[in-house]
Amino acid sequence: MTGPYFPQTIPFLPSYIPQDVDMTAVKAEVAALGVSAPPAATPGLLEVVQHARDEGIDLKIVLLDHNPPNDTPLRDIATVVGADYSDATVLVLSPNYVGSYSTQYPRVTLEAGEDHSKTGNPVQSAQNFVHELSTPEFPWSALTIVLLIGVLAAAVGARLMQLRGRRSATSTDAAPGAGDDLNQGV
């Protein structure tokens, strides 16, 4: 499985690219403009690519004018295009599906961007995708560490209070109670 249409990063997974998608033409348009799209949508998508570049994102966009049977081919197209650009993020849009590829962003970020990119309007979809990529992520690791430290501190505090309560109960029971027990027995 080698050749110009198969990326070398995942050689054991077959790609599914619809027969009606001319990957040679798509790759040539992306190389020339950064966008492969029908002429009506190209100017708006070029603006999005420029905005992404201003945000520090090397974005390539492929727009299909029809839907494939499912979204898998879009990710495969993005992977094939992305194989030529090691630092680029590739977004592939169809009327109802979205696919993406990037070596710069984690899959969870790409999936979040894809979720916001299913608008039916390619320019708005691409803008939403760029916005999601440029939005800082919530620091989940820091929150997890703070919560773990808080739970540990609460557990240690509860144990110390338990030991202090047991110690004070033992000392108050032993001192006054020792003489009373002897007097009651006589």
UniProtKB/Swiss-Prot annotation:
Name the InterPro entries for this protein: Rv1476-like
Q: Tell me the Pfam families matching this sequence.
A: Rv1476
User: Region (Disordered) spans which residues?
Assistant: 166-186
Q: Topology in the membrane?
A: Single-pass membrane protein
List where the protein spans the membrane.
Answer: 138-158
State where the protein is found: Membrane
Q: Which GO terms describe its cellular component?
A: plasma membrane
Organism domain of life: Bacteria
Keywords in UniProt for this one? Membrane, Transmembrane, Transmembrane helix
What the protein does? Answer: May affect the expression of genes linked to host macrophage apoptosis and immune response, thereby promoting the survival of M.tuberculosis in host macrophages. Overexpression of the gene increases susceptibility of the bacteria to various stresses, but promotes intracellular survival in host macrophages. It has no impact on the growth rate in vitro. Overexpression causes changes in the transcriptome of THP-1 cells, including expression of genes involved in cell proliferation, fatty acid degradation, cytokine-cytokine receptor interaction and immune response pathways.
Q: What name goes with this protein?
A: Membrane protein Rv1476
* Species name: Mycobacterium tuberculosis (strain ATCC 25618 / H37Rv)
